[in-house]
């Protein structure tokens, strides 16, 4: 991995906060498969090769299929994502792109058909966390390395 500065050494308190949030999201009410799909999709949208590489690798290790990983950028045209996953991915895209001042009521209600209040909050935190990691990684010049 190549990076511009050693941000874990320069800002240990800030990175501890990021890691604490990561720990929270891993223990959240959202299942691991959905969390990884969100992380991959948001990283694709943000163009973070380092995070795409990391999270596709993590997804494969947990048994995710190549088909679902490869087609994630076109999830809304596929029948092999669950309605819950599709709702989470739609919310992920909306929050990542921020096309308006708020999440539309229609989208909120579609997501809430599959997730309770706690899960909705957890989804938003997971989406925001991976967006933060993407921006840190891109700004610091992290690159996906060959294996």
Curated annotation (Swiss-Prot):
Source domain of life is Bacteria
Fetch the InterPro entries from UniProt.
Answer: AhpD-like, AhpD_core, CMD-like
SUPFAM superfamilies associated with the record: AhpD-like
Extract the GO molecular function terms from the UniProt entry: peroxiredoxin activity
- State the PANTHER family in the record: 4-CARBOXYMUCONOLACTONE DECARBOXYLASE FAMILY PROTEIN (AFU_ORTHOLOGUE AFUA_6G11590) (PTHR34846), CYTOPLASMIC PROTEIN (PTHR34846:SF10)
Q: What is this protein called?
A: Uncharacterized protein YdfG
The protein's organism comes out as Bacillus subtilis (strain 168)
């Amino acid at each position: 991995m190549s990076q511009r500065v050693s941000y874990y050494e320069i800002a240990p308190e800030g990175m501890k906060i990021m890691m604490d949030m990561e720990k929270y999201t891993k223990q959240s009410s959202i299942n691991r498969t959905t969390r990884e799909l969100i992380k991959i999709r948001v990283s694709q949208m943000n163009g973070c090769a380092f995070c795409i590489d990391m999270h596709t690798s993590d997804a494969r290790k947990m048994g995710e299929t190549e088909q679902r990983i490869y087609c994630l950028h076109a999830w809304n045209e596929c029948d092999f994502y669950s309605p819950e996953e599709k709702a989470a991915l739609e919310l992920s895209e909306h929050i990542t792109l921020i096309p308006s001042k708020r999440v539309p009521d229609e989208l909120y209600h579609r997501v809430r058909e599959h997730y309770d209040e706690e899960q909705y909050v957890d989804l938003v935190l997971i989406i925001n966390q991976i967006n933060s990691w993407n921006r840190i990684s891109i700004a610091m010049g992290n690159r996906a390395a060959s294996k």
